Amino acid sequence: MITTKTVNGVQIAFDDQGHEPGPVFVTLSGWAHDLRAYDGMLPYLRAAQRTVRVCWRGHGPDRNLVGDFGIDEMAADTIGLLDALEVDSFVPIAHAHGGWAALEIADRLGAQRVPAVMILDLIMTPAPREFVAALHGIQDPERWKEGRDGLVQSWLAGTTNQAVLDHVRYDSGGHGFDMWARAGRVIDEAYRTWGSPMRRMEALAEPCAIRHVFSHPKIGEYDALHDDFAARHPWFSYRRLGGETHFPGIELPQQVAAEAIDLLAGARI
């Protein structure tokens, strides 16, 4: 059952499952998605550790407008919710640009409380020109739907995976121009501020174990970027999967859950 708590004056929707001791898995979606993005992974995660799935403000069952917010508020809301739930240490599992908030959370709390972070398919380079154009497009009230639809098609990459198609068709609605425009602005600001997620990781006051799990883009240069970063930073690792889409947690839930469990095991050593 999805429940809510009032945190920082807004309703934050979540569910809380599993009772295994130790660090809690905390799932965080990308923009304009909610906790259902982790339905496939949930049985594997909660069997290993207590698992709290969090919806960003305005992303729960109540889709009324909530006013402006960004990464600072996303991080503060998540920390406030976990404090209210008496969660001590935890491992964020964040999809796509939810990863910016996960890194902010890790930076604020330190490695003792956040021993690891797993990010699913976030663009690790500086934002490509065509992606920046798409971010600007979804901020234009005259063409935001066209921009949104173009992004979705790029995420799907022609897949026939039914779980991914069902998620996009049935579980990701309810957001209009207000939320999509905000997503474009906040993501654009993150890349302009930090340059890339890897540079954001390097700025952490106390680095924790971080793993990036993804299936695309399927180009050797992207793997080389990850190899170079991992060679310079022993706390970083990555796993390329054989999926087709931007949604590895939906497309390959058992494999992605296994990566989270392995990451946590390594962080405990």
Swiss-Prot record:
GO MF annotation: an example: dioxygenase activity
Enzyme Commission number(s) from the entry: 1.13.11.-
Induction: Up-regulated by PQS.
Protein origin, superkingdom: Bacteria
InterPro entries reported for this sequence: AB_hydrolase_1 (IPR000073), AB_hydrolase_fold (IPR029058)
UniProt site (Increases basicity of active site His): D121
UniProt catalytic activity: 2-heptyl-3-hydroxy-4(1H)-quinolone + O2 = N-octanoylanthranilate + CO + H(+)
Enzyme class (EC, first level): oxidoreductase
Substitution effect: A96S: Increases substrate affinity
Keyword entries, A-Z: Dioxygenase, Oxidoreductase
Active site annotation, chain numbering: H246
Sequence positions that bind substrate: H97
Keyword Metal-binding set for record: no
Role played: Ring-cleaving dioxygenase involved in the degradation pathway of the Pseudomonas aeruginosa quorum sensing signal molecules HHQ (2-heptyl-4-quinolone) and PQS (2-heptyl-3-hydroxy-4(1H)-quinolone) to anthranilate. Catalyzes the cleavage of PQS to form N-octanoylanthranilate and carbon monoxide. Thus, leads to the inactivation of PQS that plays a central role in the regulation of virulence factor production by P.aeruginosa, thereby quenching the production of antimicrobials, which may contribute to the competitiveness of M.abscessus in presence of P.aeruginosa.
Assigned protein family: Belongs to the AB hydrolase superfamily.
Complexes and interactors: Monomer.
Protein name: 2-heptyl-3-hydroxy-4(1H)-quinolone dioxygenase
Species of provenance: Mycobacteroides abscessus (strain ATCC 19977 / DSM 44196 / CCUG 20993 / CIP 104536 / JCM 13569 / NCTC 13031 / TMC 1543 / L948) (Mycobacterium abscessus)
Organism placement in taxonomy: Bacteria, Bacillati, Actinomycetota, Actinomycetes, Mycobacteriales
